[in-house]
Structure formats: C-alpha cells, structure tokens
Amino acid sequence: MSYRMDRHSYAHTFGPTVGDKVRLADTELFIEVEQDYATYGDEVKFGGGKVIRDGMGQSPLSRAEGAVDVVITNALILDWWGIVKADVGIKNGRIYAIGKAGNPHIQDNVSIIIGPSTEAIAGEGMILTAGGIDAHVHFICPQQIETALASGVTTLVGGGTGPAAGTKATTCTPGAWNIHRMLQAADGFPINLGFLGKGNGSQPAALAEQIKAGAIGLKLHEDWGTTPAAIDNCLGVAEDYDVQVAIHTDTLNEAGFVETTIAALKNRVIHTYHTEGAGGGHAPDIIKICGELNVLPSSTNPTRPYTINTLEEHLDMLMVCHHLHRNIPEDVAFAESRIRRETIAAEDILHDLGAFSIISSDSQAMGRVGEVICRTWQTAHKMKVQRGQLPGETGNNDNLRAKRYVAKYTINPAITHGISEEIGSVEVGKLADLCLWSPAFFGVKPELVIKGGIVAYAQMGDANASIPTPQPVHMQPMFANYGGAIAATSVTFVSQKAAKKDIGEKLGLSKPLVAVKNIRQLTKRDLKLNNYLPHIEVDPETYEVRADGELLTCEPASVLPMAQRYFLF
C-alpha cells in the first residue's frame, strides 16, 4: 500500500514539485515548477536511512556499464528553456542526462544510473542554474576571477593585460605577444576564459594577426579611436575569421553620429557594449541601436537597476576609468555627457521588454565583477514592482520574467561569442558548469559552484571544526582550484585559426582549447527571450526615450532586495 505525503512534507523532503512556487531571495519574484521528472515514490535521496544505498537507489553497475560520476538529486532547474524539477547526471565533466536517477534494476523510468562510482550532491530544496558568463571583463587584476567564481560566474570574456592604462579603459588584449601571455596565465585559473584583441585599426593585417594568435574576437573602443573606417575594417576581418566584434562607440560624436556607426556596420553582426550609453557611446542616443537586427545589445551592471544613487556614483567612476582630470573642463564635459537619468531609466524597461539582451560587469572599469547576477535579479525585481506581471505569463508566477533574466547572463552571451555548444545552459552535452542556490540566497551567494563537474567554490565553515557548518561560513575555493584539476575542468576559448595552428602546444598550455564558431551569421533573433526589435527615438533636448512610440520612463529605486540584508560591507 502506497503512502501519500502532503505537499508541505514532500517539499521539505524532496523539494518542490509541479504547481509549487519558490520565492527568489527577498525579491517579489516567484517561480512555479512546470515539470517534475520524478517518479513519485521512487525518488532518490542520499543520507542515513535514505534511498541511495546499495541494492536500493544505488545499483551495482560500474562506470563502464553506465553509472554517472556525479548526480545532483531533486534540484529545481531554472534556465531559459524551463523551470523543472529533475535529477542531473554528470559524466566526464559534462551534463550527461537530465531526468530520473536511481537503480534501473528495481526502479522504473531511470535515465541516470547511480552506482558505486557515483558521488551525490543534494539538490533537494535548491535551485540549479547554469554558471554565469560575463562577456565584458577588463582583466585588470587576477583577483577578479576569485570574486567572479564566488558569485556564480564560471566564464569570463574580455581583454586586458593587468593594471595598465589601456586595460583599465578598453577591454583589449592588444597584439600576439600580450595575447600569448594571457593565454598562458589562463592555465592557472579554474574558470573558462576568452580574450578580445584590439580592433581599432584601419588596415587588416594587425587585426588578423591577433586572431591568429588566439583572440576570440576584437574590441573597438572609443579611447583608441572608433572611427567609421576602423569599424568597417574590423568587421571585415571578423567576417574572414568567424569571430565576434564588441564595440564601445564614440561618445563625443567626433567621427560621426550613431547613424554613421550604424551605416559603417553594413548589417554585419556586432556585440554592442554599453548600449544605454552611461558607460560610453554616442551621446545621447546610442540606445537606439538596440532596434537593429544585426546588433546584439548588452549593458553593464553599474546602471542595473536605476536607483537614487546611480547618477552620483557614475561621474567619479568615469573620471578614473577613462584617465580624465577634474581640472580640465573638456574632460568634465565629456564625463557629464554620458550620465543621463532618462536613458538609464529607459534601460531598465528595455531589459524587461527583452530589447536589451545581455548583462555583464565592465569589471573595475565602472562595473563590479561579483555583481552581475545579483544586479540582474534586482533589475527583474524592480520591474516586477513597477510594471507588474509580464504579458505572456501563464499562471500567477514570474516564470517568463525569470527565464528572460537568467538568459541575459547565461545563454545569450554564450550565443553571442560562439561558445553556446560548450556552455551557457543546463543542457545535455555541455560542460557541467553549474550553480546550486538556496532559494533564500538565490542570486546573492551560491551554496556550491560546480566547474566541469566538480565543486570549485562552496560555502564552507571553520576547517578545524568537527563538521563543515560552524561559523564563519563564507565562500572558499575547493579542490577544482588546485593542480591538474584546473585544466581538467575548465577550457580556454580561442579562434578557429589559432586552434588549427596548435597554439596550445606551441605555448605549452595545459587547458583544452575550444574554438569559437557560428558567429558571423547571427542576428538578434537568435538570442533567447531577449530579441525584441523596437524602433527607438531619443529627444535630443530632453533625452526622453520612446520605443515604438511609447515613452519609457520609471522612477529610481530607493530600496532594493538582495542588498544590505545579505552583506556586511
């Protein structure tokens, strides 16, 4: 005779199931379970007196006979494609299956075999997401990587060589020699890395040599001169080598206006950093570029979301990052032209509409590398409070909004930079770069960060304690950070040309090199849940922004979730 559990008891034992709702941290966002892969009564769970024991939920099958290396049990997956409860099997560092784990000898519908070779990670009552991807990183210091990993970000794309003036401002790793040194440095970090070369040049040769050296793309930045000629030449080289171009356009409109830049693109795909403009770009109307089909638009986290403090902090940040001086009037005017409350407010709404597709950090160059994820969800919360439930939601939940926002720092940057076959979502075959969150700490502090199938960072207590939980509990590096495990669980992204030239062998690299691909044919329609193409108008006098004729405006937030409740500093 079967035993029937009430919903409350079931949720506390195996986690929520279909129809149950989960609050995300202290936000006003609630997600509802859409599907559960469990066979009720045959769920697996590890522990004393629990199911994953020999002859019960654990089979006698070997790894060679199909047992997985790691199983995450009863996790609530939140990804762009769905919100589902499932077990996740990991094998050879990749997601092997999403479904029902257990012992096929005695249980039905088993798609993930647990055996003596299987480690168990408890996902009951936890939310599982793909590791975050930050696609706008100034590699100013290596300590950024620890901070990013601890926040749930497992891939960094950007440029730089350290705390040089060029790196502080422009996200470029310029030239083959610098690219090779950064590729060698990448071997020391348990994170996926990809580097952008300098794209500012009016002749192809100097740009092509950077791609051949291993750059996964090129960055055009106004501080190096983003002229129409440089844009045209850079995109021409990118077309030849199937790499992405990221652009920070001309704030001062010296070489042309936003229309000039759009014309120079010639309908070729490009990743626009700072699409709103506070971080840089044609003043005051770079924001209108998000309505172009060939533009993959992102913005960075210092303006996410618009608050009562946003404008005040930006001026000082901008002066430092772009090597400006307060005693030079022209420098001050340059800085002030970029900070506009109207376009920052519109940025909130354009993210909520899915017109802006990606959120990244702009690390130490006006952005915070450890806050990509929490600021994304703060924006989602603010929009829920100010704009209500999204049209298209089914049921009394925020599932569509949650999927839209998680896509902004996972699958969409992966697609944009040609790495979505490897990472960017919780899907079979991809690297097992995953984050496990307690719902109360969702988006703020992950419980576990899994890199290539093994725990890389975790909330860990006193190492001299008798159990793992005594205070102080804080995020600390785990075994994936050491020795050969780094190369076994992370990859470095390079161009197809560099991969074919065996650049790894020539430089003595230990990490696997993965070539970026399928980039130049992209359009905004390829981005998930964030592909709205509005006609944007910006009033040159008032800076008011309209999308398809509708005025986009909202009030700054004075209080946010996921903030001081969770942090001492």
Curated annotation (Swiss-Prot):
GO terms for molecular function: hydrolase activity, acting on carbon-nitrogen (but not peptide) bonds, in cyclic amides; nickel cation binding; urease activity. GO terms for biological process: urea catabolic process. It catalyses: urea + 2 H2O + H(+) = hydrogencarbonate + 2 NH4(+). Ni(2+) 1 binds at H136, H138, K219, D362. GO terms for cellular component: cytosol. Substrate binds at H221. It is an enzyme of class 3 (hydrolase). Gene3D superfamilies: Metal-dependent hydrolases, Urease, subunit C, domain 1. The active site is at H322 (proton donor). InterPro entries: Amidohydro-rel (IPR006680), Metal-dep_hydrolase_composite (IPR011059), Metal_Hydrolase (IPR032466), Urease_alpha_N_dom (IPR011612), Urease_alpha_subunit (IPR050112), Urease_AS (IPR017950), Urease_asu (IPR005848), Urease_asu_c (IPR017951). Its EC number is 3.5.1.5. PROSITE patterns: UREASE_1, UREASE_2, UREASE_3. Its main location: cytoplasm. Its cofactor is Ni cation. It holds the Pfam family Urease_alpha. Binds 2 nickel ions per subunit. Heterotrimer of UreA (gamma), UreB (beta) and UreC (alpha) subunits. Three heterotrimers associate to form the active enzyme. This is Urease subunit alpha. It comes from Synechocystis sp. (strain ATCC 27184 / PCC 6803 / Kazusa). The gene is ureC.
